[in-house]
A protein has these predicted regions:
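Short, charged/polar micro-motifs that form catalytic or ligand-binding hotspots
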Residues: 31-39, 226-229, 255-259
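Histidine-centered nuclease catalytic patch
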Residues: 1-4, 237-267, 276
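Short metal-coordination and nucleic-acid-contact micro-motifs, chiefly zinc-binding Cys/His arrays
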Residues: 42, 228-234, 261-265
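Structured loops at beta-to-helix junctions and adjacent beta-edge loops in soluble globular domains
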Residues: 2-6, 49, 270
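Short metal-binding segments enriched for Cys and/or His
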Residues: 6-12, 265, 272-278
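Betabetaalpha-Me/HNH-type nuclease active-site subdomain
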Residues: 4-8, 196-245
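Mixed-charge, low-complexity interaction segments
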Residues: 12-219
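Active-site catalytic microenvironments for nucleophilic, acid-base chemistry
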Residues: 52-56, 242, 271
Length: 278
């Protein structure tokens, strides 16, 4: 079963102003079980868009993000989840238990076993670019149309034959304003989905890898810990770049997931921190 919209090859965005309430309703829908998902790609794409907000180039009433930047981040974000933690990203469909991105990474590591232990950004540039092209070509046709449809054309316009997506200016403003909240909710929904498709043995292995003696409260927190370790701990929260110097430990009150102190701060690089405070 494929989610509705997955085979759409292009789509425009809704004309006119879009309220914050509408965006919250749409994001909550996408994070809920009502939005059909066979893979974690929708969460991965939302994460990539958030990571690229500062890389978008202004156009009339919209902001352009190239597929190269979008799926460069997408590939980088999935790399450790798949290669280091062996986390399955797809509900088995009878044909395969692995999503396309897992298949691409596994094929690469079969060719170059040494890549299994290095960060995505350390893969030699020519091979890394080839992987991003393959991920972009294979994954975009399954997720860009589906997420466009889920957001009722409010988030972006796209053409799969084009060079990227055009973020709606209202969507850009909303995602920038509520980046922290959206990011946390996205992790939470992603972790819930991972919990559904990965069995007990994976959780046990994760606990070893994360050096956690016992699961905290429930298995779900383990998956959230992985996502936090990978995406936030050493990265600028705003642009996603690796932090060479941690400029600020930015405390942000977090009202959605109250029990978790870990989720109450973000790290930013100097330039984003300065931009953010302007």
């Amino acid at each position: 079963y494929m989610p509705a919209g997955w085979n759409q090859t292009s789509g425009s965005f809704r004309e006119g102003p879009i309220s914050e309430d509408t965006f919250w309703m749409l994001f909550n829908y996408v994070f809920s079980d009502s939005s059909a998902k066979r893979t974690t790609y929708k969460f991965g794409l939302i994460k990539s868009i958030l990571d690229n907000l500062f890389n978008s180039e202004g156009e009339d009433y919209s902001l352009f993000i190239s597929y190269e930047n979008l799926f460069g981040k997408f590939a980088e974000n999935y790399w450790n989840l798949v290669t280091k933690y062996q986390l399955k990203q797809m509900l088995p469909d009878g044909k395969s238990e692995y999503s396309k991105i897992e298949q691409i990474f596994k094929a690469l590591i079969q060719e170059e076993p040494s890549f299994a232990d290095i960060p995505f950004t350390s893969i030699p540039e020519a091979q890394r670019k080839a992987i991003i092209r393959q991920v972009s070509s294979d994954c975009r046709r399954n997720v860009i149309g589906a997420l466009h449809r889920d957001f009722q054309a409010c988030l972006y316009a796209f053409d799969l034959k084009g060079d990227g997506i055009f973020l709606n200016a209202y969507a850009f403003d909303f995602m920038l304003k509520y980046k922290v909240e959206i990011e946390k909710l996205n992790y939470y929904a992603w972790a819930k989905f991972l919990e559904k498709i990965n069995d007990e043995s994976v959780v046990v292995k994760l606990l070893d890898k994360l050096e956690l003696a016992t699961p905290q409260r429930e298995d779900l927190s383990v998956f959230r810990q992985v996502l936090y370790n990978e995406f936030e701990q050493c990265n600028c929260f705003y642009c996603g770049k690796k932090l060479h110097e941690i400029h600020v430990d930015h405390f942000i009150p977090w009202s959605f997931i109250k029990e978790d102190k870990l989720w109450n701060f973000v790290l930013a690089c100097p330039s984003c921190n300065i931009r953010k405070s302007n």
